[in-house]
């Protein structure tokens, strides 16, 4: 049975990990054993934070909508209830964008929500 030499595959594996750790400080960027752990942890953080990003952006949109709606003399929860009643199907991302970029258009939507609540 011939002997297996692993130099080529080991070097390729090490190069791949060190390349992924490019830019890391200290031994995390150039020592394989430590770089491997750092890259794995970075991957875990990336996986976790891709999911957290969705929560964070939703919270940001809600904060922006709430601020814009309070300028119109209404609270966020009442506004959302009014939108549901008026059957206006705009998501929070679009509403937040309107609140920032098109104040007149957003004010019209708020008026529709108020009208639906009073009717």
Swiss-Prot record:
SUPFAM superfamilies: Ribosomal protein L20. Disulfide bonds: none annotated. Belongs to the bacterial ribosomal protein bL20 family. The keyword rRNA-binding applies. It comes from the Bacteria. Binds directly to 23S ribosomal RNA and is necessary for the in vitro assembly process of the 50S ribosomal subunit. It is not involved in the protein synthesizing functions of that subunit. Signal peptide: none annotated. Pfam families: Ribosomal_L20. GO terms for cellular component: ribonucleoprotein complex; ribosome. Keywords: Ribonucleoprotein, Ribosomal protein, RNA-binding, rRNA-binding. This is Large ribosomal subunit protein bL20. The keyword Cytoplasm does not apply. One of its GO terms (molecular function) is rRNA binding. One of its GO terms (biological process) is translation.
